[in-house]
Structure formats: structure tokens, C-alpha cells
């Protein structure tokens, strides 16, 4: 029991070093987690609950990564303009049916 308690305390202290949480008065929580010096993950969570049966939850996650590659070689690429239909009518119709079904399922 004492060994697991020590491990839990060490784990919590290690997480506290890498995650920094800021809570503001409006119920908005900002969390910045740094996994390595090259990768930073930021999350913003907003939760609003009232006496009515309505509640709003927003979660946004952004990841920034630094690219490290081999600069000794290079590859030439060309960009070709696309010519064709932007969206077929059948695809558009099925997409709208899918969106309506999804909204109906959520309500």
C-alpha cells in the first residue's frame, strides 16, 4: 500500500509539471499539455449548464508540431489545376440526408 501511494504521488507530480490548467470565473477551463519540446497540445473546454434542460459544451483541440526532416535531399513537385465537377448532385443529396438524420438523432 505504501509503495503504490508513493508511485501515485510521483505520477501526480509528474503530470502537474507537464499540464497547466487555468480556470476563469466564467466556467472556461484552459489546459496546455506539453508532451515533448516539439509538440504542444492546447485544449479549451467551455461548459454551460442552466436550470433549463439546455446545456452547451464546446471542446476545441489544437496541436502544433515542429517538423524535423532530412534537408540533404529534395523532391520536385508540380501543382496541376483541377478541372471537373465540384460536387455531384447525388453526393450532395445523400450528404444532406445524412446531415438531417444526424441532427434528428441528436435531438
Curated annotation (Swiss-Prot):
Record localization: Secreted, Cell wall; Membrane
Record PTM text: The GPI-anchor is attached to the protein in the endoplasmic reticulum and serves to target the protein to the cell surface. There, the glucosamine-inositol phospholipid moiety is cleaved off and the GPI-modified mannoprotein is covalently attached via its lipidless GPI glycan remnant to the 1,6-beta-glucan of the outer cell wall layer.
Glycosylation sites: 71
Protein name: Protein TOS6
Keyword Membrane attached: yes
Signal sequence bounds: 1-19
Record keywords, A-Z: Cell wall, Glycoprotein, GPI-anchor, Lipoprotein, Membrane, Secreted, Signal
Family to which this protein belongs: Belongs to the TOS6 family.
Main location: secreted
Keyword Ribonucleoprotein among record annotations: no
Organism: Kluyveromyces lactis (strain ATCC 8585 / CBS 2359 / DSM 70799 / NBRC 1267 / NRRL Y-1140 / WM37)
Lipid attachment points (GPI-anchor amidated glycine): 84
Membrane topology value: Lipid-anchor; GPI-anchor
One Gene Ontology term, aspect cellular component: side of membrane
Source organism superkingdom: Eukaryota
Propeptide position ranges: 85-107
